[in-house]
Amino acid sequence: MTAVQRRSAIYEQLTHADAPISATALAQQFSVTRQVVVGDIALLRAEGHSITATPRGYMIPAETGLRRTIACHHSGADTQRELFAMVDCGCTVLDVIVEHPVYGQLTAPLALSSRYDVEQFIRRMADSHAQPISALTGGVHLHTLSCPSEAVFAHLKATLAGMGMLYD
């Protein structure tokens, strides 16, 4: 298989995947190193393909639902509660954004759409002893969400307000 054929096959897999695919899994499948896959993804992006890197792997972002941004404020200990509320309302948490005084806007992709996704994310944070990115801003952060409707987004805002997590 040539490099061009491999990139085409990788893109095809990402297009049909229901969940992110790790660079390691793609490397094993195509009998190349993880670094080769990372390079292939970079070349696919350079060709104009929209490929998102999440903590669980690469994915093609879905174009369904309404995109909304919500401002939140809470401690790191409440991250799981916040994310559970979002996915329980039917939203996908696309990313988290903070405003850093030196670097400006920092965005980290998440792509969390279920309690399982949230649990895996929280487990990786705990295993790596990492702090949430919102620790940089005292807990203030934004999330970009994909919501099925305005009504769902309004319900989520009310839920987070009731939890004391909505920043306004």
Predicted features along the sequence, with ranges:
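Extreme N-terminal segment that seeds HTH/winged-HTH DNA-binding domains in transcriptional regulators
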Residues: M1-Q29
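Key DNA-contact positions within bacterial/archaeal DNA-binding proteins
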Residues: Q35
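Short, hydrophobic-biased segments on the C-terminal half of alpha helices
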Residues: I41-A42
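Minor-groove-contacting beta-hairpin "wing" of winged helix-turn-helix DNA-binding domains
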Residues: I51-A62
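Mid-protein regulatory/catalytic core that forms ligand/cofactor-binding pockets
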Residues: G65-D168
